[in-house]
Amino acid sequence: MTRCEFFTENDRINGFSISGHSDFDEPGKDIVCAAISAVVTMAEATINDVCGAKDKVRVKDGENNRITLTLPASCDEEDSVQAVLTGMMLTLCSLRDDYPDNIEVLEV
């Protein structure tokens, strides 16, 4: 199962951590994993390249692949960044509703 954690405080999303594999199908054929990857990649690229927010991204490869993004305490494009992260969370929640055995979404 893929675990999607959103770090929130005072109605602000401070970052996220996505780990694991959805196990919907074998790697390379897993549409749930592909959808999650596309959503995460879009959010990370938008925050970095379009919004110009200076964030910290760590990617760890291995059996429990993980990507973690942590925002600074404030950024110039705060409203845009929060809109991107909220859209990401809503999209992942929609996937969770369709594939509850393969993805979980948590606010921590």
Give the role of each language-model region.
Residues M1-I31, T41, A45-V108:
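N-terminal intrinsically disordered, cationic/polar leader segments
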Residues V32-I36:
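Short, conserved glycine- and acidic-residue-centered signature motifs
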